Amino acid sequence: MEPADKNYGYRKKTMTIKEIITEINKIEIDIVDFISSYRSEQLVSNYDDWNYKDVIAHLLEWIMFSKNKLNAIVHNQDFQEISNIDIFNKQNYIKNKNNHITELQKKLIFELNEYKNIVLLYTEADLQRKDLPTGFSFELWRYMIMDTIIHPVMHLLYYLIKTKNYKLFFKLCKKYNDIFYCYAKGNIEVYSFYEYIEDSKKFIENIKELGEQYKNDDMIHAVLKANKIDGNI
């Protein structure tokens, strides 16, 4: 897949510590806005059908894990990797199921602020390293952006599609479009919801509906293409 300079505005090739901090500040605001949009939601959930509170709890656990890993790496300490992601996610779902959204929000914002402090322990040269034990073969800055921006935003975007909140989906997608393509080197597959889908039939119906509302928008067309949906709907 070639970089998306021509069609999608992809320009940036790397990120600095200051830029990563700025992106984390942005996601903090958008998480709070997301919670505000769904605070009155009364949806009863289960592990295969999350509500907005489950999404926030999931993000909290992953930000905490990523932060602890980076803290261990910078101090040359051992850390325990996740051996089974499904078990990790399910255990945390059960642990947080009855926690109030106010508590979850407070903890998540705290962890994101702690994450920024950990980022500051690294150097600009460290950000370009691919040999650190993150569990991935790409640069450290890409790992940080994956865990603090890409993964959280994709969960928010999926939930917005799931609940047909297309206006907020478009706004959020637009806001993070450049950073998504920077992270993914212009590859539209960064917008694939394959690993997030709960109900594939409903997802396809809703994302096609999204496409109908924004049929002339190149960014939304790319999202549809990444999810194997014909843009000419």
Language-model features and meaning:
Residues E2-Y8, E41-I87, R129-E189, Y194-I233:
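Short, contiguous alpha-helical
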Residues N7-R11, M15, E19-T22, N76-F79, ...:
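Solvent-exposed interaction patches of small proteins and small membrane subunits
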Residues R11-D49:
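An N-terminal domain-cap segment
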Residues K12, N89-Q105, P133-Y143:
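Acidic/His metal-coordination segments adjacent to aromatic residues that form catalytic metal sites
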Residues K13, I20, I24, D48, ...:
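Aromatic-acidic/polar surface patches that form glycan- and anion
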Residues I20-E23, I27-I31, W62, S66, ...:
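Alpha-helical packing segments of well-folded alpha/beta enzyme cores
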Residues I31-Y38, I73, Y122-A125:
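A short secondary-structure junction motif
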Residues L104-L132, F136, L140:
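Internal, conserved structured core segments that host functional sites
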